[in-house]
Regions:
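Bacterial N-terminal signal peptides that target proteins for export
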Residues: 1-8
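Hydrophobic helical h-region of N-terminal Sec-dependent signal peptides
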Residues: 9-16
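C-terminal motif of bacterial Sec signal peptides marking the signal peptidase cleavage site
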Residues: 18-21
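Conserved, structured core segments of small domains
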Residues: 26-145
Length: 145
């Protein structure tokens, strides 16, 4: 190799950039189980339901919340880990809500649409087998049908 020092410098720069980007994430270093624990505890304080952005652990105030089909019917702490895993690979949003008909608390990986995008949100909901979408700013549920 003609320029080994150049190669070492580039390798060092890339390593530093990679490490700093990993540590900048608010959930870097937290296991999937630890994130699920935090969200589980959050759900205990929000018995009627919530929408939570995992990176900031804050509740978005606006948007149309639509659940992904892949995480439907998730009720237990173990199933919540699956929901968190899916959310981290997609939009970073988790939703939870209590169903008074069956007395179960549901967790979903959620996609958030802008509030002026009701038609695309309803289309996505239908594609994902959802019965409704939720408009966060209004606290309003809109039926898909």
């Amino acid at each position: 190799m003609k320029h080994p020092r150049f190669f070492i410098v580039i390798l060092t720069i890339c390593s530093i950039a990679l490490c700093s980007s990993c540590s900048s994430s608010r959930y870097a270093g937290q296991s999937l189980s630890a994130l699920a624990d935090r969200i589980w505890l959050f759900s205990q304080d929000h018995p009627d339901g919530f929408t939570l952005a995992i990176p900031s652990m804050t509740e978005p105030a606006v948007g149309i919340s639509v659940a992904y089909a892949e995480t439907q019917n998730s009720h237990s702490h173990r199933q919540l880990r699956k929901v968190v895993r899916h959310a981290l690979k997609h939009d970073g949003i988790v939703g939870g809500w209590f169903n008074s008909d069956d007395s179960l608390y549901y967790f979903d990986s959620t996609r958030l649409f802008p509030e002026d995008s009701l038609i695309p949100a309803l289309r996505f909901a239908k594609q994902n087998g959802q019965y409704a979408v939720f408009i966060l700013s209004k606290g309003e549920t809109i039926s898909v049908e």
